[in-house]
UniProtKB/Swiss-Prot annotation:
A Pfam family: CIDE-N
A GO MF label: identical protein binding
Family to which the UniProt record says this protein belongs: Belongs to the CIDE family.
Function field: Lipid transferase specifically expressed in hepatocytes, which promotes unilocular lipid droplet formation by mediating lipid droplet fusion. Lipid droplet fusion promotes their enlargement, restricting lipolysis and favoring lipid storage. Localizes on the lipid droplet surface, at focal contact sites between lipid droplets, and mediates atypical lipid droplet fusion by promoting directional net neutral lipid transfer from the smaller to larger lipid droplets. The transfer direction may be driven by the internal pressure difference between the contacting lipid droplet pair.
GO annotations of cellular component type: COPI-coated vesicle; COPII vesicle coat; cytosol; endoplasmic reticulum; endoplasmic reticulum membrane; Golgi apparatus; lipid droplet; perinuclear region of cytoplasm
Full protein name: Lipid transferase CIDEB
Localization terms from the record: Lipid droplet; Endoplasmic reticulum membrane; Golgi apparatus; Cytoplasmic vesicle, COPI-coated vesicle
Subunit description: Interacts with DFFA. Interacts with DFFB; inhibited by DFFB. Interacts with APOB. Interacts with PREB/SEC12; facilitating loading of SCAP-SREBP into COPII vesicles.
Bilayer topology annotation: Peripheral membrane protein
Length: 219
């Protein structure tokens, strides 16, 4: 009691504040941001990769290795070329955002509309109007995936858009699904064989009974 009475209230309050600040700092630093999926491409959009990263620097490091780039890299949005130059902006991006990685001297350019966009081998007429446009993007989020993931995006009349993402499966998941389907198929085949066997048995028994009745009538 004498020790508590000798304490200065301001010193006690400062000690409690320091302890709470230190505890909050440790809790904050011990919880790193989670890994999130992104899709990155080079400035010509010829190479596309699916990468997972928790921070902007981590994504740039993985893109440097995966896309075989060098030098200082710049990260921009593929859609409109907006620079992703801060970690705060990067954390605001949604999952599966399409990003473009630029090397020194390279610049963003819009997507070209031409033969591949319309698929008929002819350029789009000048006074035509879009009814529907479909974009297919195949990518891998993990190098161990056997099949890449597929993203399908549909835009109607240039106003309404919707997208569907089909995630790829790794070797273990593919093997598990294959075994599950094989087991189901074998079970169905077993039931079918049992049904055929029962039908044949009834047919044989019926034939034997018919033969026995025929012999009795002959006597």
């Amino acid at each position: 009691m004498e020790y508590l009475s000798a304490l200065n209230p301001s010193d006690l309050l400062r000690s409690v504040s320091n302890i709470s600040s230190e505890f909050g700092r440790r809790v904050w630093t011990s919880a790193p941001p989670p890994q999130r999926p992104f899709r990155v491409c080079d400035h010509k959009r010829t190479i596309r990769k699916g990468l997972t990263a928790a921070t902007r620097q981590e994504l740039l490091a993985k893109a440097l290795e995966t896309l075989l780039l060098n030098g200082v890299l710049t990260l921009v949005l593929e859609e409109d070329g907006t620079a992703v130059d801060s970690e705060d902006f990067f954390q605001l991006l949604e999952d599966d955002t399409c990003l473009m990685v630029l090397q020194s001297g390279q610049s963003w350019s819009p997507t070209r509309s031409g033969v591949l966009s319309y698929g008929l081998g002819r350029e789009r007429p000048k006074h035509s109007k879009d009814i529907a446009r479909f974009t297919f993007d195949v990518y891998k989020q993990n190098p161990r995936d056997l099949f890449g993931s597929l993203n399908v995006k549909a835009t109607f009349y240039g106003l309404y858009s919707m997208s569907c993402d089909f995630q790829g499966l790794g070797p273990k998941k593919v093997l598990r699904e294959l075994l599950r389907w094989t087991s189901t198929l074998l079970q169905g085949l077993g039931h079918m064989l049992l049904g055929i066997s029962s039908t044949l048995r009834h047919a044989v028994e019926g034939a034997e009974q018919w033969q026995q009745k025929g012999r009795l009538h002959s006597y």
